[in-house]
Amino acid sequence: MADQLTEEQIAEFKEAFSLFDKDGDGTITTKELGTVMRSLGQNPTEAELQDMINEVDADGNGTIDFPEFLTMMARKMKDTDSEEEIREAFRVFDKDGNGYISAAELRHVMTNLGEKLTDEEVDEMIREADIDGDGQVNYEEFVQIMTAK
């Protein structure tokens, strides 16, 4: 399944994996998974975290290594983001709930994810998504970015 991923996707997932793998030991524990999910505004229970890990933990050792993570991501991409998941993600970014993602809101979420971006990088991300040129990202623009293949 993971063999259907492009090199670019694998590189992106490697970066994401590193964000989860706080201690850099090459595996993701339930604790690390919980930390990242909470930084994204989710509040999973210990049992839910364990379920998520068990779903992809092929060798049954209780943690996720990179190949297992790739399998999980490939599976998720196959179920391509449902409308509801995209809406949920938009709400995480749109802190003040005004229907737009501003540069400040984007910076805030990326910082919570451990991504220290320069103002230029944040502005560049907004510009890439901002189809109507109003300096922020509305829901339609967000959907375009999230569903772009």
UniProtKB/Swiss-Prot annotation:
InterPro entries: CALM/Myosin/TropC-like, EF-hand-dom_pair, EF_Hand_1_Ca_BS, EF_hand_dom. GO terms for cellular component: myosin II complex. Ca(2+) 4 binds at residues 130, 132, 134, 136, 141. GO terms for molecular function: calcium ion binding. Coiled coil: none annotated. The modification N6,N6,N6-trimethyllysine is found at residue 116. Transmembrane segments: none annotated. The modification N-acetylalanine is found at residue 2. Keywords: Acetylation, Calcium, Metal-binding, Methylation, Repeat. Belongs to the calmodulin family. This is Calmodulin. The gene is calm.
